[in-house]
Each structure stands twice: as structure tokens, then as C-alpha cells.
Amino acid sequence: MRKMVNIGFIKMGNLGMSQVINLIQDEIAAREGITVRVFGTGAKMGPADAADTESFKQWNADFVVMISPNAAAPGPTAAREIWKDVPCIVVSDGPTKKEAREALEQEGFGYIILPVDPLIGAKREFLDPVEMASFNSDAMKVLSSCGVVRLIQEELDRVTEQVASGKSGEDLELPHIFAKPEKCVEHAGFANPYAKAKALAALHMAEKVAQVNFPACFMLKEVEQVCLTAAAGHEIMGAAAILATQAREIEKSNDTVFRQPHAKNGTLLKKVKLYEKPE
């Protein structure tokens, strides 16, 4: 008999991917064999917020997915110390350096590092709730259409299947993935090469956003410089979302959108033509 799998999600702060990561394994709320619970700390991700996640251990997750910006920051680092005795997959936009990623693996953590999940222009002079929501909407358009969502979903399903089959703890094989644009787009299932090229361009643009917004967030002081730079970063993200939409529209016009829904038992089904049944 297959085991019921408890999957915990710890959300500290916010990435674009944070919006849907706990939903992508059960997209129509009909999957059997998994139970999902989420512990979130809102927009903040400090050490005190990390300490609060310990109460989530009472739920006894088989593995947890810890998503936050900058996994090397003090808060996420403190959270990993709390959760080091539970199989844990870190999903973050950094660290991007090989040595830091290898350190995560040596400490027993899985990871999916997403340099394509963009840094928002988080300065009071520029960002209000509407701008924040709009930016995250643009980010999700790229993450969903260009392969990032499917990459993460497939990796989480792979670990889930191991638990369902009886593996646990240190026996689980966790992912160790640095999800550069070229890797992400291969998971999108594009049939048309021009659609794929547009999606790859969108991913490269999303990766560039952090380079533009970082000075606005942490270095620049003059209001005009802060606002101009952050606005430029957000314009890049908006343009990337348009490219991602165009890529999917090409596939729709050819009736070649690749879909991969879950069966009730969690098996991945496939379909391409709109009127086909998934098999």
C-alpha cells in the first residue's frame, strides 16, 4: 500500500514562484495520496520569523519546501538550522555561486536555485501594493509559460513518488538544480522554435531584472535615481511577460500547447491538441 505523503511548504518573504508553488502538484484539487500544508511569514524573512516556523514541525511533514529570496540571508539560514533534521528542498533566487550551492548540498539540503525569479524594486519611493502585485503578475507569466513551473513541479513530484514508495529521511534523493534560462526553457514543451526563442529571451530578461533592481534596493540614495532604476527594472519584467505571452500564443495558434495534468493518483498525463483527452 502506498503511503500518504505530507508535503510542507515554508514561505519566507516572497518570490514570484511563491504565489503557486504549493498548488502545482494538485492543480484541480483532485489528487489523492498527498496532503499539503503551508506556513508563511508574510513579506518578512528575518531570524525571528524563522524561529516561528518551528511550530510547523508538529504537522510531521515527510519533506518540506522552503522558498524565500536569498537563501544565504540570516532568516532563511536560521530556518534551515531549525529544519535540518527534515528532508528539505530550498527554492530561492540565490545563492548563485557554485561554492555556496555545494555547501547547501553538503549540509544535506536539496535546492532549486532560480536566477530567473526576479528581484522586485522594493523601495518605498517606488513600490506600493499595486506595483508589487503587478510585478509579481508579470513574473508569474514568465515563470509559468517558459518552463520554470513545470521544472519545479516535476522535481517535487519525483520526491513525492519516492516517499509514496516507502523512502524517507536521508534515503530521499533531493534535487540539486541551478535553473538557468537554457535549462528552464527545455521544460516548457515548445514545438515552434520561434516560440521557444521568445520564451528564452523572456527568461534572460527576467534574470537581468535583478542586476538592474539591486542598486535601486541597496545602493542608490537619491530619490530620482532610485525611482528611475527600479522603474526600469519593472519595465524589463513587463516586456518579458509580453514575450512569454507571445510565445504561448504561437503555440496556441498551431494547436501545439503542451499540457501535463496530474491523474487522480498523481501520474503525469500528457496532451497537445486542445480537444484531445490527456493520456
Curated annotation (Swiss-Prot):
Domain of life, per the record?
Archaea
- Does the keyword Signal belong to this entry? no
| Involved pathway(s) | One-carbon metabolism; methanogenesis from CO(2); 5,10-methylene-5,6,7,8-tetrahydromethanopterin from 5,10-methenyl-5,6,7,8-tetrahydromethanopterin (coenzyme F420 route): step 1/1
| Enzyme Commission number | 1.5.98.1
Q: Name one GO biological process term.
A: methanogenesis, from carbon dioxide
Instruction: Drop me one GO molecular function for this one.
Output: methylenetetrahydromethanopterin dehydrogenase activity
As its record notes, the protein acts as a catalyst of: 5,10-methylenetetrahydromethanopterin + oxidized coenzyme F420-(gamma-L-Glu)(n) + 2 H(+) = 5,10-methenyl-5,6,7,8-tetrahydromethanopterin + reduced coenzyme F420-(gamma-L-Glu)(n)
Q: Which UniProt keywords apply?
A: Methanogenesis, One-carbon metabolism, Oxidoreductase
Task: Tell me which Gene3D superfamilies the record gives.
Answer: 6.10.140.120, F420-dependent methylenetetrahydromethanopterin dehydrogenase (MTD)
**InterPro entries per record:** MTD (IPR002844), MTD_sf (IPR036080)
Could you tell me what this protein does? Catalyzes the reversible reduction of methenyl-H(4)MPT(+) to methylene-H(4)MPT.
Membership in a protein family? Belongs to the MTD family.
This protein is called F420-dependent methylenetetrahydromethanopterin dehydrogenase
Q: Which organism is it from?
A: Methanosarcina acetivorans (strain ATCC 35395 / DSM 2834 / JCM 12185 / C2A)
Gene encoding it?
mtd
